[in-house]
Amino acid sequence: MAEISILGAGGLTGKELLLLFSRQKEHEVVHITSDKLAGKTISEVFPEVSFPKNLVFKKHEDIVPLKSLVVLAVPNEVSVESAPKFLDAGHKVIDLSGVYRLHNQEILEKYYKLKHTRFNYINRAVFGIPEIFRDQLKNADFVSNPGCFSTSVILPIFLLGQLRKNLRPRIIVDSKSGVSGAGGRTEDSGYSYTSVYENFRAYKILSHQHEPEIREYVYSKSGLSDPEVIFTPHLLPVYRGILSTIVLEFDSEPEQDLISILENSSLNEPFIRILKTPEEVELKKVQHTNFLDISLRKRENTLVVVSALDNLVKGAAGQALQNINLMTGAKETLGLLP
């Protein structure tokens, strides 16, 4: 059993983490923090979350996690300093922010709009997509949990296997997200449900922080020479879920059955589902699950891949629990499958 401390447990991802941990018995949540909710109990804040112990929210600086694994679900600027502090104290750390994902400091600081004072810790972090980095995650003490959009793009491309070598270095991604995947906790941010009801729009065009993340990890796993990524996120009038449409081009038309390639690549992956047609991929099938659904269609040398996931589960808290299971030697599906 692993003891878990969750910093930032009062946010959207923090709540999802609490729900997931409440459904299993091998990991024990021992500390939860939220500066805004300090002094309140879980049952007061989230009555739908049931734990044997009615934990009390504390302020970040008031906890001493002892031997626990620390999950950081806090703002980017807080993670910059918190991750090294807990690592230096001997804790395993999973960071759900984006500040330890990119290996180019200039690009990281540009997209995250901050000065990264602990960049020397970047190479210590394992990028937390289990289907790609499973062996490294089993021995990791520091995991940088991937972005939700990034997961929906990097993983489908990775599953193309050797065909990735024939891709042209230009990737066009059109992603639609519910408000919880786009900063939906601030009422006046333009990302609240009342702002998007009966509405639909693009945001952060050519400036979203997941664009360089997609570029870096598609490059590192595919061998594409610094691929150009054109990523456009859109805001849907729904609460949760991401659907991504990825347009790829091959140097020449592949003759293989691409659905079969995806099926073979994901044969032993418990959270990857390959659907026969891209029209079958939809949000309702993945909401409240850790599944990533994928399908595709080819016309000559053009390939359109469609993927869907729940941004709060496979795109955040669920993938974090999957990583925790690997880091602690637990069954990978613990708390994520019935």
UniProtKB/Swiss-Prot annotation:
InterPro entries attached to this UniProt entry: AGPR_AS, AGPR_type-1, NAD(P)-bd_dom_sf, NAGSA_dehydrogenase, Semialdehyde_DH_NAD-bd
GO cellular component, one term: cytoplasm
Pathway: Amino-acid biosynthesis; L-arginine biosynthesis; N(2)-acetyl-L-ornithine from L-glutamate: step 3/4
Catalytic residue list: 148
Entry keyword set: Amino-acid biosynthesis, Arginine biosynthesis, Cytoplasm, NADP, Oxidoreductase
One of the GO BP terms on file: L-arginine biosynthetic process
GO terms for MF: N-acetyl-gamma-glutamyl-phosphate reductase activity; NAD binding; NADP+ binding
Cellular location(s): Cytoplasm
EC number: 1.2.1.38
Catalytic activity, reaction form: N-acetyl-L-glutamate 5-semialdehyde + phosphate + NADP(+) = N-acetyl-L-glutamyl 5-phosphate + NADPH + H(+)
Pfam families for this protein: Semialdhyde_dh, Semialdhyde_dhC_1
HAMAP family assigned to the protein according to its UniProt record, in alphabetical order: ArgC_type1
NCBIfam families xrefs: argC
General function of this protein: Catalyzes the NADPH-dependent reduction of N-acetyl-5-glutamyl phosphate to yield N-acetyl-L-glutamate 5-semialdehyde.
Protein name in the entry: N-acetyl-gamma-glutamyl-phosphate reductase
Organism: Leptospira interrogans serogroup Icterohaemorrhagiae serovar Lai (strain 56601)
